[in-house]
Regions:
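Trp/Phe/Arg-rich N-terminal binding region typifying the photolyase-homology
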Residues: 1-115
Length: 115
């Protein structure tokens, strides 16, 4: 069965989430949040940001459960996590929200685009 992968980054909500909406219009989706230790080690990341992300992830998971889905929380470098996901169950599209981040998240997004 083909499906689209929705990679949630900082925008952890469904309301007006263009990437989620586009993927859902195409068919089944798998929603993931990748916790990337290297990004959380950046000087502009604080414990409060991490705690807010976890709280938002719990709320997103609850909303997805109400809709019959779930949020998969994965840990690792984004390209490596995507490699593992694709090897286990190939997806045909990858959707994510364009975010404003720092140099590290920009480099990560460029690496994923090359992937």
């Amino acid at each position: 069965m083909s499906y689209g992968l929705v990679w949630f980054k900082r925008d952890l909500r469904l309301a007006d989430h263009a990437a989620f909406a586009a993927a859902a219009r195409r068919g089944p989706v798998l929603c993931v949040l990748i916790v990337e230790p290297a990004l959380w080690a950046q000087p502009d990341a604080a414990r409060q940001h991490y705690e807010f992300m976890l709280e938002s992830a719990r709320e997103l998971h609850a909303e997805l459960r109400r809709r019959g889905g779930r949020l998969h929380l994965l840990v690792g470098e984004a390209v490596a996590v995507l490699d593992r996901l694709y090897a286990a169950a190939p997806f045909d599209t990858l959707h994510s929200h364009e975010e404003t981040g720092n140099a590290a998240s920009y480099a990560r997004d460029r690496a994923v685009a090359r992937w």
